[in-house]
Amino acid sequence: SLKKFSFTKNEKFIQEVLWRVYWKGWLELRPTVWKDYLFDLEKIRKDYINNQNYKNAINGSTNLKCFDEWVKELKENNYLHNHARMWFASVWIFTLKLPWQLGAEFFLQHLFDGDAASNTLGWRWVAGVQTKGKNYIAKEWNIKLFSDNRFQNIKLNEDAQTIFDSRTYSIETKNFENIQDIENKNLIIFDNNLSFETSDFKDNKFNKIFLVLNKNENRKIKLNQKNIEFKENLFEDQKKRLLEKSIDCKIIDINDLETMKENLLCLYPSVGENLDFINSKKLKNISFLYRKIDQYSWKYCNKGFF
């Protein structure tokens, strides 16, 4: 990108990429945060299954026009601008008074760019449990200003206290070093690394590349159909590009990994549903390969975001 455009034009894009790297690194060093989130979510789902306020929120029928429009946009486009995501989360938590865990799930179900780390930790930050005692409060004037006065009479809770969570998380010691002998082995790739030809390992020779699709049957958070189809199309596109380069590849279901007994290499999927599957099935024949940017950056992700 820097070869085509000036740093000034690239700066915001680079910042957003590095924010994702930071969030992923922070969660890698504290993976129990993700585990606790899924545990809490399972209980909260049961508690709110018949909650009308929750149903109104996910159906975009809260009578808070800006929020209802964001729900519609999210469902139709599977995307929200970063600023709108912050407003959405703040309204969900502090005005609608719904658990942040359900909101984070709603985002992951619909966002094409949904990511376990940036999504979970972003919602935690808005709630005030990521940086203890500091929450993000959406303000009426701010929404009006940056939506070109599209919305009026926005009644928000602008004096909300942070959500309290007494749990703390210590940094875990992790090894992100790559093994030396990676030639002439089979490689598996998940949906977070579907650009093999631009990866750090594009020049290595692999026997075969398996593109691993994780469908809803193995997910704790079920993706909506548009999101599933989006991922399937990404896999098909990556397969097409690999075949054009005469690289032997195949799309497989994540369950097929259990029947593959040979030693496998894997572009590291990061903390989330794909890694959860590998760990839950105790697939010891898989060795991870880490990106250089992650190897360099994650060791510095030891502080919170203020």
Q: Residue locations for each model-derived region?
A:
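Structured secondary-structure scaffolds
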Residues: 1-116, 125-131, 136-138, 142-194, ...
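Trp/Phe/Arg-rich N-terminal binding region typifying the photolyase-homology
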Residues: 1-15, 19, 25, 29-42, ...
